[in-house]
Amino acid sequence: MNDNCIFCAIINKKVPAEIIFEDDQFIAFKDIHPIASVHVLIVPKTHFESINDIPDEDSTSLSNLFIYAKKIAKQLGLYESGYRLLINTGKDGGQTIPHLHVHILTGKINIPDQGK
């Protein structure tokens, strides 16, 4: 855990969030600034700053992230109609929170201008 990370604070229940799923590996909650009609974040409880920080030999963490994304999409009723998974990595990739997370999005998506 990282004391300066908002997602770690949500995991530790120090910051409120609208949690839709949680187990010992992941937490999923609604984005407080949604860019689509459905915008959920899936966050590993292990603090990785980005996908680049997952060790190559740790394929389980990454595969589980996508398995959970599929399960949560099904729970939200998006499985049949479709959804988008998005991972932003690094500043130029649009990452604003330095804790690995996957966005589940559906509907019209409004990606804000990032000053580029």
Task: Label the model's feature ranges.
Residues 1-116:
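HIT superfamily nucleotide-processing domains
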